[in-house]
Amino acid sequence: MTELVGRTRARCVETLSLDSTGTRNALSAALVAELSAALAECGKDPDVRAVVLTHTGTTFCAGADLRDPPDPDALVALLRQLIELPRPVVARVTGHVRAGGLGLLAACDLAAASATASFAFTEVRIGVAPAVISLPLLPRTDPRALARYYLTGERFDPAEAVRLGLLTVTADDVDEALAPVLDGLRRSAPQALAETKRLLTARVLETFDRDAASLTALSARLFSTDQAREGMTAFLERRDAAWVV
């Protein structure tokens, strides 16, 4: 079986690379399961100080795989796992991020992107809503500023992603920008990192506890509607949906 998540390690930093370029690293049931297993191993390994989540190809993550979507509960569990992992997780993005991929980005503790990256909440254009991914997104961003992109599905650039709170930093050379961040994590005590992360994620986890069930139900309901079926069919057929005027 082809591995969908690559793994390398350098000086106690484990790099997990989404590696399903044929689907633009879309969140399939298999990819979600493999990433979850890799994260679980990182969380148990005392030699892992931090995790970098990155990708191969030109897309960090295209969102849910419409041909092999993950169970909504599995996606919620993956996002929560990123947040609860007792190691800082740093997103490294050098390509496009769409829909559910932005949920992964928001679940990471820090996020850096190259100047060529682009972002879009495309759910509304296929007849659904960014429901489950709102669990990590809304507590960590400015909802008023986010409203434009949630409601329109427009693309936006890394500078705007920084302004919204989706990114920590953007730079022409993302690895150069991340070098001092990773150096700082390597210099920090593991126990202190874990407890400091707990402080930073407490409000996000409160949102999961309160809203996960209702947002999962909303996602399931919307994906079963006629508009969602039309939207997904139009997307796969590369045409405008019937409601476009």
What are these regions (language model features)?
Residues 95, 109-110, 148, 152-154, ...:
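Well-ordered beta-strand positions
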Residues 134-144:
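Hydrophobic, secondary-structure "cap" segments at the distal end of domains
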Residues 47, 54-82, 207:
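Glycine- (often His-adjacent) and acidic-residue-rich active-site loop
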Residues 112-117, 167-213, 226, 242-245:
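C-terminal long alpha-helix characteristic of the crotonase
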Residues 82-126, 158:
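Glycine-rich beta-to-alpha active-site loop
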Residues 1-56, 179:
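Conserved CoA-thioester-binding segment of acyl-CoA-metabolizing enzymes
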Residues 149-150, 161, 199, 203, ...:
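Helix-loop "lid/cap" segments that line or gate small-molecule binding pockets
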